[in-house]
């Protein structure tokens, strides 16, 4: 028996205190695949972060010898390493691709993706087919990251390396803003598509519309298939995909042409041999590969024998120099269709002059043909793109400026307002895509704040109206790209003042009263501040009426944006098609309402307890869209009680679905309909995790705790976009 036990132990060591973490174990998700995913609300908590709790990246960045770092990066560009030699002796094109692909995952639909958290280090991005061999670029950067340590994040280093690469080859940039803070594990909240295979594309409707909120047209690609849609070499069809993808990144036609032409002025594509020679991506590579993937058995497996995209060749005869040769080649030749040594569709110039041949990546004395991708020829054969491209070709300075500006936008679009930018190269110019807000120059004393709150509460506006307006203004914030929020009071402006969810007629009435109050005040106070202060005053009143005398923290200093500072088309994507906090849903969707609530909470940067307490509080405060009764489980509307949770959990009631999708809350004995609810309301009693929070807040001894937690979560949302407060606090510490 003892020998048998020893044998069993040697076969399976997972017993006792050792837990089997292998992928073949059964998880809750396996048992219940439709289980609500709340983990996205806690994906970046302190437990995953190795820094001390008081670590402040912005403060560390201020200690950085920025110019020394740029010089080290400049030297790196031409310090070719035998383990991964630089094409043409210059790593610049590789680092441009790395930076571009870090930033290029951004999409305006939900603000997710982009360069601001350094997630190219993690799955799935580190193993996307389109990011093949960028693991080598990151390894080349490691000695510099090691040297400068906490003073420069990976996220900032990726983009700065791209900037230095452009500058080192004669290209123009207009600046750099630091401030991107690394995360320490993948961002699980981002939906990259439903496909189960790399390079598959099942994301278009029958009429060809790309699924919201995706921007890339193919799973595992940053943008579009360079060989053409579905691998078909049709430049005009490729132009349609390009236009839609870049539009969903927030780029117009001119910016699109500038980026493609400017980026392809440098470097080459790699397809020296069949893809069968290429090993697994980093996440699938053997442990001894130490995180490096795509190791190739073709020839030397590097240099001129490299296989990456499968397309082979440089675009220009001068692949490490900023010039006009991309357009010279694009418009100077006819192009014939062929396949690369790897079998990918590409185009070759007809009868090229010897001066227009490119150098070999390893041997500059050897000349090789250039090529164009199907997506490059889209710039020649799409009428609108062609107009822009020919204009750039005739105006080199305009092209250089357009590329520099588009590159800055590409690499900074997901950073939010300019107040977050760090470093000596931040451009002085304000850009419309940064959602600029005028600075304010007033301060308010506590006495003045109390006086304004009294005016607001005596204005005839109800607690419900004040809370609704403040929530509508602040809850546009997206933690993903730091856009939206109460600062700027853009709820006064198009398009927000026309959104259905904001009840335009009621909103106009509330704003009119705020404007009257503003005119009556002895000093200029922004409407943005008044909206938030009004909501805070209403919450205080509601808490007092519940028996709790509390203060809602308020920090003045918000500005009022103008319509001229507001890009209507850009802000249109912030319109919520569902807001479970207001029990609003524009129409029926394939995604359940409770999942849309969790997604909204994640974009607001909320935890599951914060989401729970806010929903419960907003219901009893009467914040529902158009005063819908669903989920308002109280007879004391406008009073900040825990009634939502108490009545949700009361076993005197049963919950009965109706044909309209609404649920009736009926007395079990009499059958009387007491309340109505949506799935968003019922999920707090149905989901075991959310029910545990609901039970916590329903306890008799947690009524005050509920009020205080609601206020903390409320203030978090109201101040979500107040990066100026963070900046001022940092400056006061360093002063």
Swiss-Prot record:
InterPro entries reported in the protein's UniProt record: Catalase_peroxidase (IPR000763), Haem_peroxidase (IPR002016), Haem_peroxidase_sf (IPR010255), Peroxidases_AS (IPR019794), Peroxidases_heam-ligand_BS (IPR019793)
Sites annotated Transition state stabilizer: 97
Free-text remark on how the cofactor is bound: Binds 1 heme b (iron(II)-protoporphyrin IX) group per dimer.
Polar residues bias locations: 1-26
Pfam families attached to this UniProt entry: peroxidase
Enzyme Commission number(s) of this protein: 1.11.1.21
Functional summary from the UniProt entry: Bifunctional enzyme with both catalase and broad-spectrum peroxidase activity.
Protein family according to the UniProt entry: Belongs to the peroxidase family. Peroxidase/catalase subfamily.
Protein name: Catalase-peroxidase
Source organism (scientific name): Geobacillus thermodenitrificans (strain NG80-2)
């Amino acid at each position: 028996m003892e020998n048998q036990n020893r044998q069993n132990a040697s076969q399976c060591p997972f017993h006792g205190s050792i837990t089997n973490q292998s992928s073949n174990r059964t998880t809750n998700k396996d048992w219940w695949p439709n289980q609500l995913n709340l983990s996205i609300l806690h994906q970046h908590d302190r437990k995953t972060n190795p820094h001390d709790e008081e670590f402040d990246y912005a403060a560390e960045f201020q200690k950085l010898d920025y110019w020394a770092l740029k010089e080290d990066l400049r030297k790196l560009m031409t310090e070719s390493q035998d383990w991964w030699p630089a094409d043409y002796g210059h790593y610049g094109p590789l680092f441009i691709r790395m930076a571009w692909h870090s930033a290029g995952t951004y999409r305006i639909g939900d603000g997710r993706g982009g360069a601001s958290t350094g997630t190219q280090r993690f799955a799935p991005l580190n193993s996307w087919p389109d990011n093949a061999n960028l693991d080598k670029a990151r390894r080349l950067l490691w000695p510099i990251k090691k040297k400068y340590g906490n003073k420069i994040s990976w996220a900032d280093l990726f983009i700065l390396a791209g900037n230095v690469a452009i500058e080192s080859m004669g290209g123009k940039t207009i600046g750099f803003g630091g401030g991107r803070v690394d995360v320490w594990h993948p961002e699980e909240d981002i939906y990259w598509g439903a496909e189960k295979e790399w390079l598959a594309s099942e994301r278009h409707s029958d009429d060809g519309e790309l699924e919201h909120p995706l921007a890339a047209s193919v799973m595992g690609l940053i943008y579009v298939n360079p060989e053409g849609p579905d691998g078909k070499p049709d430049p005009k069809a490729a132009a349609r995909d390009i236009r839609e993808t870049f539009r969903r990144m927030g780029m117009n036609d001119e910016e699109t042409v500038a980026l493609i032409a400017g980026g392809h002025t440098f470097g080459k594509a790699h397809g020296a041999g069949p893809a069968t020679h290429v090993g697994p991506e980093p996440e699938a590579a053997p442990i001894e590969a130490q995180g490096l993937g795509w190791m190739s058995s073709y020839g030397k497996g590097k240099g001129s024998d490299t296989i990456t995209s499968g397309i082979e060749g440089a675009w220009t005869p001068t692949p490490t120099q900023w010039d006009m040769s991309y357009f010279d080649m694009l418009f100077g030749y006819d192009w014939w269709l062929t396949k690369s040594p790897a079998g990918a569709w590409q185009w070759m110039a007809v009868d090229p002059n010897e001066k227009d041949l490119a150098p070999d990546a390893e041997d500059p004395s050897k000349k090789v043909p250039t090529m164009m991708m199907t997506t490059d020829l889209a710039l020649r054969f799409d009428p609108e793109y062609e107009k822009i491209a020919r204009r750039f070709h005739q105006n080199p300075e305009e092209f250089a400026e357009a590329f520099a500006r588009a590159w800055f936008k590409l690499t900074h679009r997901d950073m939010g307002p300019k107040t977050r930018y760090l470093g000596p190269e931040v451009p002085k110019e304000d850009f419309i895509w940064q959602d600029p807000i005028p600075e304010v120059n007033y301060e308010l004393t506590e006495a003045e704040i109390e006086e304004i709150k009294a005016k607001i509460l005596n204005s005839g506006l109800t607690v419900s109206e004040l809370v609704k307006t403040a929530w509508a203004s602040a809850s546009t914030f997206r933690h993903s790209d730091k856009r939206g929020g109460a600062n700027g009071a853009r709820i006064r402006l198009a398009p927000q003042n026309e959104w259905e969810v904001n009840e335009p007629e009621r909103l106009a009435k509330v704003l009119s009263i705020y404007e009257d109050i503003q005119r009556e005040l002895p000093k200029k106070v922004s409407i943005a501040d008044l909206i938030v202060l009004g909501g805070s005053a209403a919450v205080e009143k509601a808490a007092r009426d519940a028996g709790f005398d509390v203060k809602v923290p308020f920090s003045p200093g918000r500005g009022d944006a103008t319509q001229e500072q507001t890009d209507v088309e850009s802000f249109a994507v912030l319109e919520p098609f569902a807001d479970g906090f207001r029990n609003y849903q524009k129409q029926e969707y394939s995604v359940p309402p409770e999942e849309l609530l969790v997604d909204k909470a994640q974009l607001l940067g909320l935890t599951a307890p914060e989401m729970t307490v806010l929903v419960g509080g907003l219901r009893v405060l009467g914040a529902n869209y158009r005063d819908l009764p669903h989920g308002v489980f109280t007879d004391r509307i406008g009073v900040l009680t825990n009634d939502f949770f108490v009545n949700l959990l009361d076993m005197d009631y049963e919950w009965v679905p109706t044909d309209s999708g609404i649920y009736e809350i009926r007395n079990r004995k009499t059958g009387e309909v007491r309340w109505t609810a949506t799935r968003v309301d019922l999920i707090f009693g149905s989901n075991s995790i959310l029910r545990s929070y609901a039970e916590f807040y329903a306890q008799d001894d947690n009524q005050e705790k509920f009020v205080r937690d609601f206020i903390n979560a409320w203030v978090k949302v109201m101040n979500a976009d107040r990066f100026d407060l963070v900046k001022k606090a940092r400056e006061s510490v360093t002063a």
